[in-house]
Amino acid sequence: SKEGMSYEEPENDEGVACTGQYAESFCLNGGTCRYIQSIGEYYCICVGDYTGHRCEKKQV
């Protein structure tokens, strides 16, 4: 339910772009850092064959 929310922006599971040191160094191997405000978690959108929470693993 949307009651009590003061902003119009829809909830988005992709989160928002990370800032500061997280944007710089949280994701490895070219991954894009995202922050999910509702749960206070950072995660990475990986590129190529990389996987893992911080794109630290390469799939074979």
From Swiss-Prot:
Residues 7-12 form a propeptide. Disulfide bonds join C18-C33, C27-C44, C46-C55. InterPro entries: EGF-like_dom (IPR000742). Residues 14-56 form the EGF-like domain. Residues 1-6 form the signal peptide. Its main location: secreted. The keyword Secreted applies. CDD domains: EGF_CA. GO terms for cellular component: extracellular region; nematocyst. Keywords: Disulfide bond, EGF-like domain, Nematocyst, Secreted, Signal. It is found in: Secreted; Nematocyst. Has both toxic and EGF activity. Its EGF activity consists of rounding cells (morphological change) and inducing tyrosine phosphorylation of the EGFR in A431 cells, but with a lower potency that human EGF. Belongs to the EGF domain peptide family. This is U-actitoxin-Avd12b.
